[in-house]
Each structure stands twice: as C-alpha cells, then as structure tokens.
Design a protein with these regions (language model features):
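Catalytic nucleophile serine of serine hydrolases
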Residues: 85
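Extended, subdomain-level signal for the structured scaffold at the beginning of enzyme domains
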Residues: 1-77, 81, 89-101, 109-155
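Active-site-adjacent substrate-recognition loops and nearby beta-strands
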Residues: 105
Length: 155
C-alpha cells in the first residue's frame, strides 16, 4: 500500500538478509528482501517506522538491541510509528509503550496493560500522546485500514 501510494519503502532486518514470513505463525510463506540492517538505520533518515506483526518476527525484533533502539529513536524524535498484531510487543521492550493507548492482537493485551498501556479493541487506533503518533491495528483482517492510516499519516 505504501509503495502503491508512491512512498519509498526501506525494509531493514537484524542481519540485513531477507526476512522469512509465516502464515498463522506456523506455515512458511514468502521471503521479504531487506534493503539494510537495523544497525545502520537511523530515525533521522525516515518519516515513518512500521513494526510488522506475527509472533515470530515481533519476538525477534523485541529482543534485538538495534530494533529497540530504532523504535525509541522514532518516539524520541516525535516521528510516527505503526504496529500491527504482535508488533506492539516491541514498544514494551523499547520502553515507549507506557502511557499510550493502542490496540493489538488480543493475546498480548495483558502484556501491554502490564506495561502501562490503555488497550482498546478497534480495527485501527491513532494515539498522538507522549509527543509522537502511534498507529496500531489488531490483526491481518485490519490491514486495509492500517495501510490507509499509514499512508494518510505521512502524505
């Protein structure tokens, strides 16, 4: 959706190599080519950060020092961040979740609330609190609304 809107997209991974996606957290799906490594990414070079969903990739990002650093850089710089499904997990470990209102995949609701988040059950939620905009959605069914909100936020 971002590319279709004419927005330049950079995909970063912890290794700089392609990212394996999965369907339903168990079936291998396509690989997404990475353009750079998270270690080389700086918030000052981008307008928006999107944290992917899915248990495996979100869990990988939340324990990655460079992934957490980049999320914190975006929030500190007042730049928008989007997170879908299990993606908001990363916000907890980047220490930027507290005080925000957001949605997510239902199973991580307790983790978010324990981190000081106000959780809502909405297709899309835009939270401008704490000096930066956070756009969140619950699951893959919410992708159309999530993608539109991401495009609208930086257009």
């Amino acid at each position: 959706a971002l590319k279709k809107a004419g927005i330049e997209v950079t995909v970063a991974s912890n290794s700089g190599e392609s990212i394996q996606t999965v369907t339903g957290d168990k079936d291998w799906a396509s690989k997404v080519n990475a353009d750079s490594r998270l270690a080389d990414a700086k918030a000052s070079d981008y307008d928006l950060l999107v944290i992917p969903g899915g248990t495996v990739n979100a869990d990988t990002l939340r324990i990655d020092e460079d992934g957490r650093r980049l999320v914190k850089e975006f929030a500190t710089a007042g730049k928008p961040v989007g997170a879908i499904c299990h993606g908001p997990w990363v916000l907890i470990d980047a220490d930027v979740a507290k005080g925000k209102t957001m949605t997510s995949y239902i199973s991580i609701r307790p983790d978010l609330e324990n981190a000081g988040v106000s959780w809502v059950d909405k297709e899309l939620f835009r939270c401008p609190g704490n000096g930066w905009v956070l756009l969140t959605s619950r699951n893959p069914n919410d992708l159309p609304a999530f993608a539109k909100a991401l495009v609208d936020e930086i257009s």
